[in-house]
Amino acid sequence: MSKGHSLQDPYLNTLRKEKVPVSIYLVNGIKLQGSIESFDQFVVLLKNTVSQMVYKHAISTVVPARPVRLPSPTDSEHGDSEPGNA
């Protein structure tokens, strides 16, 4: 995994696994809503009443409907550390 994906992939994966509703804002200002069904290096599959394949280069912002906590590398060892308090 490249350096550029060290935050993106765990963030999207947490949103996917926890089925967190998200608003995705595109670079042209359009707002899409749904939950992340899947993603890869280039696209995000957003599920609402239908599934939409959204190219990552068109995404400006991903806004979760509720706060999410990203797993940190030390979580698997300690389980109680807060992100940013390493």
From Swiss-Prot:
User: Could you tell me which residues belong to the region Disordered?
Assistant: 66-86
GO biological process terms, alphabetically, are: regulation of DNA-templated transcription; regulation of RNA stability; regulation of translation, ncRNA-mediated
Instruction: List keywords of the entry alphabetically.
Output: RNA-binding, Stress response
Task: Spell out the molecular function terms from Gene Ontology.
Answer: RNA binding
Sequence ranges of Basic and acidic residues compositional bias: 75-86
User: By its UniProt entry, which Pfam families does this protein fall under?
Assistant: Hfq
Checking PROSITE patterns in the record gives:
SM (PS52002)
All residue ranges annotated as the Sm domain in the record: 9-68
Keyword hit for RNA-binding: yes
Q: Which InterPro entries match?
A: Hfq, LSM_dom_sf, Sm
What's a single GO CC term here?
A: cytosol
| Subunit structure as annotated in this protein's UniProt entry | Homohexamer.
| Matches recorded under PANTHER family | RNA-BINDING PROTEIN HFQ
Q: What is this protein called?
A: RNA-binding protein Hfq
Native source organism of the sequence:
Pseudomonas putida (strain ATCC 47054 / DSM 6125 / CFBP 8728 / NCIMB 11950 / KT2440)
